[in-house]
Amino acid sequence: MPRAKRRKRASPTDLYRTCKQAGTCPPDIIPRLEQNTLADKILKWGSLGVFFGGLGIGTGSGTGGRTGYIPVGTRPTTVVDIGVAPKPPVVIEPVGASEPSIVTLVEDSSIINAGASHPTFTGTGGFEVTTSTVTDPAVLDITPSGTSVQVSSSSFLNPLYTEPAIVEAPQTGEVSGHVLVSTATSGSHGYEEIPMQTFATSGGSGQEPISSTPLPGVRRVAGPRLYSRANQQVQVRDPAFLERPADLVTFDNPVYDPEETIIFQHPDFHEPPDPDFLDIVALHRPALTSRQGTVRFSRLGRRATLRTRSGKQIGARVHFYHDISPVVPDELEMEPLLPPASTVGSDVLYDVYADPDVLQPLDDYYPAPRGSLANTTVSASSASTLRGSTTAPLSGGVDVPVYTGPDIEPPVVPGLGPLIPVAPSLPSSVYIFGGDYYLLPSYILWPKRRKRVNYFFADGFVAA
């Protein structure tokens, strides 16, 4: 019989809270939490005759009381609180009985005598004021005696500021745009009107590039990942999936935009018109793709297979697709590999035959050397046939069938000539002219030394 699995009991604190009022507590819960165990009773009875001070000996945590544990033979550390530095006291001087009690705060100012005489000054009588009766305004001549006019003229040709198409030689009298004609006190500026080129007009489209390397107007947008492993692939054969996909999910006819995501609200139990669209709560916007030689209309859907208590719906993603039409592969026109032979007239058919009297037997040809691949082709044609239009391989003693029809000119390969065998060279004598010569060391026959091996004890060692 299998042993029952032991379940852990709740903590004593949790049991004490629930079973105290009901009176169903185990016998060890209440004495432990109310400090009424046998050890607590011994400490209570022993404390009547023994005083332990503030050590805090009991069933609680051993913290040593408020003062903590102090090692034997040492004094406790004393913390000295310095606090804020004291300010020096204000010394108050006592006032004697003979001194006045009124303290003068402001010193006496000097007394001014209002009846004093005016001071007398010695010397000149001051500035002299001169008056005039002339009413004409004063005119000051500030113009110098000699008038000088300065005119600056400059002419330059700089291709950086002038377009190459309109570069011309400077004309007579052409000056720059800054001419100053002035005197010592006044001046006037001369200028030249230059037409300005308009870079932007009000009638533009607003899409003109504003930099040297503008971004392209159309950017590639990443398409939906329809064929991932997380999506269930379902093929829909009903053509209503292209225009009215909502009719396959529910029977009612909601107003919706076929280019946007469709959200469905279903009751707890419902049966869709198409069983492939069971538990579908959302159909995303359509997408046109090309896969496996067909044009495919696709929509991603989301099922609501499970529903949690919080109201969240959990389900798989489904890829619904409908193949519209197959993509026909492009047909390429085949061209002949060899060009057609040049004929005298168009659509001319002629016969080709071989003359056996002109041919020579194949035995007259030299045999091909062994070890190489040699193809010998013998061709013959009648005198009435165009030269080089047709080649017919012939062999001695075998009839070659000849057919009628247009000829194709093959590439001309030059044939190999007759092979003449070369006689092997015979060894001949070598004559050396001269008085002094040296032989190579490899041709010098040195005498070989024979190593002597002793086979007797008297010779010093024994052969192994």
Swiss-Prot record:
Assigned keywords, A-Z: Capsid protein, Cytoplasmic inwards viral transport, Disulfide bond, DNA-binding, Host endosome, Host Golgi apparatus, Host nucleus, Host-virus interaction, Late protein, Microtubular inwards viral transport, Phosphoprotein, Viral penetration into host nucleus, Virion, Virus entry into host cell
MF annotations from Gene Ontology: DNA binding; structural molecule activity
Protein name: Minor capsid protein L2
Known role: Minor protein of the capsid that localizes along the inner surface of the virion, within the central cavities beneath the L1 pentamers. Plays a role in capsid stabilization through interaction with the major capsid protein L1. Once the virion enters the host cell, L2 escorts the genomic DNA into the nucleus by promoting escape from the endosomal compartments and traffic through the host Golgi network.
Subunit relationships: Interacts with major capsid protein L1. Interacts with E2; this interaction inhibits E2 transcriptional activity but not the DNA replication function E2. Interacts with host GADD45GIP1. Interacts with host HSPA8; this interaction is required for L2 nuclear translocation. Interacts with host importins KPNB2 and KPNB3. Forms a complex with importin alpha2-beta1 heterodimers via interaction with the importin alpha2 adapter. Interacts with host DYNLT1; this interaction is essential for virus intracellular transport during entry.
Keyword Phosphoprotein in record: yes
Subcellular location(s) of the protein: Virion; Host nucleus; Host early endosome; Host Golgi apparatus
HAMAP family: PPV_L2 (MF_04003)
Short motif (Nuclear localization signal): ranges: 1-10, 445-453
Pfam families in the cross-refs: Late_protein_L2
Disulfide bonds: C19-C25
First and last residue of the signal peptide: none
GO biological process entries: microtubule-dependent intracellular transport of viral material towards nucleus; symbiont entry into host cell; viral penetration into host nucleus
Family membership: Belongs to the papillomaviridae L2 protein family.
GO CC list: host cell; host cell endosome; host cell Golgi apparatus; host cell nucleus; viral capsid
